[in-house]
């Protein structure tokens, strides 16, 4: 009898162990490296934003981002890419399934995910043309931003209240602490989908952010994604 009990307990232990491993596997965040003309940037993608995660992975695997410019750079704010029209003429344009070119429903999870320095975010049209805040099919930006003090964050909160009205988010104490220590761009919180973050290469993001630009925020010297690849999934 004792032998049977031991066998049952051993099986239960193996089952529980397998479940734990499966759950851990589900929590593993995919990683992508962007090889740029300024250096490499590694990002991890949030599993809590599955629509954006899966779209980004699919586009990377199709080679969509290869040869694209960082076409919009705002010093002390962010760097943006993903416009197919900016592709290097020497790089072949991939043939994409139409489903990859459809807008993505918003997956906004504030304050879990915020516009801290290094945040990977989906670009989109403004609220007037896009009240549901659906994301661009392909374009994204990486936040560099700046560090804030309490007075500056108070002003940011007032600005958020004015621009978002009843939908305004609150900059919690935890969020404010991150903006004071790490930096970022809090005025976008609650309005755009944040679907990942930089894990390596934030200094490369800084170097791109510091690239001289013209009056249209376009870099005066081309900065491109040479290639992008999934390194873990």
Task: Please report, for each region that a protein language model flagged, where it lies by residue.
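N-terminal secretory signal peptides that target proteins for export/translocation
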Residues: 1-3
